[in-house]
């Protein structure tokens, strides 16, 4: 393969080398009209909805656990440095690097699992939500700021982007404002409203104007998809939006935890479980 360029970047007392090469594979665009939509969060790292299978919630607690483990060790080192009026040390820089490496590895496992799911289900359209406040760190609250900033969402999105291109699929990145507040079931436009049709009664639960209970992250994921297809050609838009609005909505998400030691056999069993859990629907 022809090397395009090599990049060497100093980072936390060490050097990281990236090699970028040209991929000469001839890739045909995926023509499938089936779709998935991904909402990124904290406790549910990825909330995946589709017209092919029940919603899948990827557990985000293992990522939180990694951050908490390293944050505790970093805080302990920083406390010892205070007496010497120092703010950093070789050990602290090493901990930051190790945390980054660990999260980078976990994001690869998660993105690879999602791509395998997409290939397994022959999905042609993939949408992921994006929140500019992940970088701006505004109006999320002190605790949420820290949690969101320490989860490398853009790394996950970038990995999905290039892995999907190899499958002939272009990832649609959709700004996600108001997708968690507006009711997908009530066909409410995803924009600021004087009065919202639905509401979040408690954490993880969204209730529509008709009193229908739905997982809050599932509602957000479907709204992200609804916002994204407005930017597509009208013919494609009509074909895609007719699927979720006409068939109804799945009520019981399938919760999946990707262990650090997940084997190929374990992954295939999870994909099979998703495949046999076809949507249980009700009329809107």
Model-derived segments and spans:
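Substrate-contacting helices/loops that form the catalytic groove of nucleic-acid
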Residues: 3-5, 11-157, 235-284
């Amino acid at each position: 393969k022809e090397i395009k360029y090599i990049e060497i970047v100093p980072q936390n007392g060490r050097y990281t080398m990236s090699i970028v090469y040209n991929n000469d594979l001839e890739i045909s665009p995926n023509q499938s009209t089936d779709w998935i939509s991904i909402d990124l969060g904290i406790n549910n790292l990825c909330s995946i909805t589709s017209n092919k299978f029940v919603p899948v919630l990827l557990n985000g607690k293992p990522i939180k656990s990694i951050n908490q483990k390293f944050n505790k060790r970093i805080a302990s080192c920083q406390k010892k440095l205070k007496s010497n009026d120092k703010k950093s040390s070789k050990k602290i820089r090493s901990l930051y690097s190790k945390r980054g490496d660990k999260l980078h590895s976990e994001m690869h496992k998660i993105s690879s699992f999602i791509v395998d799911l997409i290939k397994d289900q022959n999905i042609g359209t993939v949408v992921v939500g994006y929140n500019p406040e992940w970088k701006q760190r505004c109006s999320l609250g002190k605790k949420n700021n820290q949690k969101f900033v320490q989860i490398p969402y853009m790394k996950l999105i970038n990995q999905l982007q290039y892995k999907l291109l190899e499958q002939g699929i272009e990832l649609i990145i959709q700004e996600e404002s108001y997708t968690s507040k507006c009711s997908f079931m009530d066909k409410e436009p995803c924009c600021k409203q004087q009065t919202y049709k639905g509401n979040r009664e408690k954490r993880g639960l969204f209730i529509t104007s008709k009193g229908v209970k739905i997982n809050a992250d599932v509602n957000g994921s479907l709204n992200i998809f609804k916002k994204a297809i407005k930017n597509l050609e009208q013919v494609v838009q009509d074909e895609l939006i007719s699927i979720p609005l006409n068939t109804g909505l799945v009520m019981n998400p399938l919760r999946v935890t990707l262990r650090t030691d997940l084997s190929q056999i374990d992954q295939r069993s999870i994909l099979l479980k998703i495949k046999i859990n076809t949507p249980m629907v009700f009329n809107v």
